[in-house]
């Protein structure tokens, strides 16, 4: 503290006092005097405020499987006026799943379904907002990527008697596929040792023997 002959005084703190939180304070009293020696005091109080924490965020991507996926991680928080890595515990229900975070910043996301309907190139995303203990917000973004789930495809085993001409037989396969239209096949024409087989996009196949 400095004071001039006109009584104008000026106080400069010797640090930023960022460690002071709301409700904290430091006080100091300075004694000055008039020109005839009469003393007086100047009392300075520095009140704490909430200095915003520096909080990490998270962005994760996981592939869907045949069951509800789970992923987890840990956020960090650097806070000059609160304990580091202190978070507000929370449990958040989202559109694609639920997220929990504990006081140490450890979070866990659990999907609410297997998301088997997602094909390669498909995805669902969701962003959760969490906060450190001082209220500084951060986000956790979870992306679930689609994969190719194997279809359940029928087979066919047929037996035909030979005749005096090249025999023909046919049938239809079925396909159940969670991430593609059901009963969708790749058309093909296959030359075999005993005959030729064709199959169309609907799974209908025809075998024609190459001799009688």
Predicted regions: what they are:
Residues 47-54, 147-152:
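Proline/serine/threonine-rich low-complexity linkers at boundaries of modular beta-sandwich domains
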Residues 54-93, 152-190:
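Extracellular ectodomain surface segments
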Residues 1-48, 66, 75, 91-145, ...:
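Acidic, turn/loop-rich segments in luminal/extracellular domains of secretory-pathway
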